[in-house]
């Protein structure tokens, strides 16, 4: 590839937690003189660098990093806000004539870049509640039969057990008279086709789980408990997105004296593995054409 092509190309590097994607992205950035943009919904928050495996000072000194630890945990964040910030960062990087490397594990961020973000009208809270109650009353199988004539593509696409997305698809169709799939089809991608290359790091399952376990031990050594303790003293709403970071709830329970450290670590290991499995499933289903890399 010519140097001009490398500079203009945007690299999208995705993968499950602990797959080694951050190290891969940093190595690539050093080789091609690129800049890194965060695509992880938890690494966006300040004060959780260790718990979310964000880049260290040594790593940020090796290549420019953008959109890491920029939002206070007391504040919310959304795909739309990330997309706006990311597209601005990408434009600035390319204006400097540098390659841009977007790395993270939040699939919806990558989808927003490559498929666009649907401008769906707000759904009233009352309709969300009605759709949720309908799901609870009828169960998933019958709810899917109700959703199918409203949005057959969404019904077929949404995985079993994904109540939130099923309920949203129903609520959007009822509120707007137009299926969520139709809204999404009408969107334009933020990145032009051909301007980017997608890679998914896909280590063997056993190796990935071993990496997850090892990472948790390192997090404790590097101060993850101190990060959780600092946020707990602020009395933040447990429903805030930042406090849903994998491991936060388990370590917070330990700090409150509800569990031993070993129990907290065991619970965090299980949650980390479940999270990694969900990510693997998402990237397998949503990015089938991206190149797979075995680290």
Curated annotation (Swiss-Prot):
Region of interest (Interaction with substrate tRNA), residue spans: 40-43, 164-168
Keyword Nucleus belongs to the record: no
Classification via InterPro entries: Dimethylallyltransferase, IPT, P-loop_NTPase
GO terms for MF: ATP binding; tRNA dimethylallyltransferase activity
Binding site for substrate: 17-22
Pfam families cross-referenced by the UniProt entry: IPPT (PF01715)
Residues that hold ATP according to the record: 15-22
Function: Catalyzes the transfer of a dimethylallyl group onto the adenine at position 37 in tRNAs that read codons beginning with uridine, leading to the formation of N6-(dimethylallyl)adenosine (i(6)A).
The protein's name in its UniProt record: tRNA dimethylallyltransferase
